[in-house]
Amino acid sequence: IKASAIKILEKPKNILNILQMAIDGSIDKSKEMFEDIIVQGTFSNDELLEEFYNAINDVTTRDEVKAKLYIKLRDVDDTLGRGGSPLIQFIALLYLAFISPHLKGVMK
């Protein structure tokens, strides 16, 4: 694990930083840092859901983007409850964060 990931692991609130990086266009770095968290296995799915919920609330972006992220987080929660892969689900959330600031209109 890289030193940057260890710093992230020590402070779960840095999920906010990971999400903000995705929104700001640094999807590769955001994804890499999140993958390190998953590989480490430090947090349960419920803890990650809570951290992402808090991060969406605090992230700097338009309300429309936050709404899309909350909807996706609801879907992530549902899929994880049915045995889905946390890595795939949360990375999909990060990619939505990456593209959402550039989308127009309502997500369908």
Language-model regions, residue ranges each:
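Helix-rich C-terminal "collar"/helical-bundle subdomain used as an assembly and partner-interaction module
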Residues: 19-108
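Alpha-helical tetratricopeptide repeat
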Residues: 14-18
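Long, charge-dense, solvent-exposed interaction surfaces that engage phosphate-rich ligands
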Residues: 1-13
